[in-house]
UniProtKB/Swiss-Prot annotation:
The keyword Magnesium does not apply. One of its GO terms (molecular function) is structural constituent of ribosome. Transmembrane segments: none annotated. Belongs to the bacterial ribosomal protein bL35 family. Gene3D superfamilies: 4.10.410.60. The keyword Nucleotidyltransferase does not apply. It comes from Geotalea uraniireducens (strain Rf4). This is Large ribosomal subunit protein bL35. GO terms for cellular component: ribonucleoprotein complex; ribosome. GO terms for biological process: translation. It holds the Pfam family Ribosomal_L35p. It comes from the Bacteria. Keywords: Ribonucleoprotein, Ribosomal protein.
């Protein structure tokens, strides 16, 4: 059986934590930032955990991470 290929786009966007959860970055941080509040932009810098409903599909894309 051949090895499963890692989805390169997903590998650049997601990281696994030590406990097996998958971390992601927030969207809406690249442009049109003048209309967003300071607090909103600050909170968008923080990482987030992938939702439970998406976890299985994303884990398939990054099997060896």
């Amino acid at each position: 059986m051949p090895k499963i290929k890692t989805h390169r786009g997903a590998a650049k966007r997601f990281r696994k934590t030590g406990t097996g959860k998958i971390k992601r970055n927030h969207a809406f941080t690249s442009h049109i930032l003048t209309s967003k509040t300071r607090k909103n932009k600050r909170n968008l810098r923080k990482g987030a955990i992938v939702a439970a409903v998406d976890h299985k599909n994303i884990a398939k894309l990054i099997p060896y991470m």
